[in-house]
A protein has these predicted regions:
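Internal, well-folded beta-alpha domain core
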Residues: 2-155
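Short, basic/aromatic-enriched C-terminal tail that caps enzymatic domains
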Residues: 156-163
Length: 163
């Protein structure tokens, strides 16, 4: 929750954090919206003659690029799910996208555990805002709920954290 931040970080979060939405496209933390339940993958062809990915792709990508330019950001830190991030036209993003993966060791094998991943994405977003992180190196210091930095997967620009 945005309210878990120190008040002096509200402006920074409002400037830097974006939330992808199936209904609203792209949101800032303090945008006022009505509660809703609509997944990006919901079949909307009969309603809007398009799926939500196609409907939002150009607007969301254009808005993100404008905000990246206005904020002077060097990276786009992607903490969204693959489902939601596929709404972005990656070829049109003007900076390098940094992805995150959180895996848990179970029976000598690393696995993604859905609810843990959601919690860790939120924790990482808070860590980035709390520390005003705008480069890759400080992200490696993230340690929450036994998750710690493992390595960078260069082929996908992914920072892997394991527990």
């Amino acid at each position: 929750s945005i309210r878990s931040l120190e008040e002096n970080l509200y402006d920074y979060a409002q400037k830097k954090l974006r939330i992808l939405s199936g209904l609203y496209g792209i949101l800032k933390p303090f945008d006022v919206i009505q509660p809703y339940r609509l997944e990006m993958g919901t079949n909307t062809v009969n309603l809007i003659n398009s799926d939500l990915y196609k409907f939002w792709k150009e607007d969301v990508s254009k808005t993100l690029n404008e905000e990246i330019k206005n904020n002077g950001s060097a990276f786009l830190f992607n903490l969204s799910s693959k489902e939601y991030f596929s709404v972005i036209n990656h070829k049109k993003i003007s900076v390098k996208t940094i992805n995150f993966d959180f895996k848990t060791k179970l029976n000598d094998e690393y696995k993604n555990i859905g609810m843990q991943i959601k919690k860790m994405r939120g924790s990482m977003a808070k860590f980035i805002i709390d520390n005003r992180i705008e480069s890759i190196e400080p992200l490696k210091k993230f340690q929450v709920n036994n998750f710690k930095f493992e390595k960078i997967l260069p082929e996908s620009n992914t920072l892997l954290f394991t527990s």
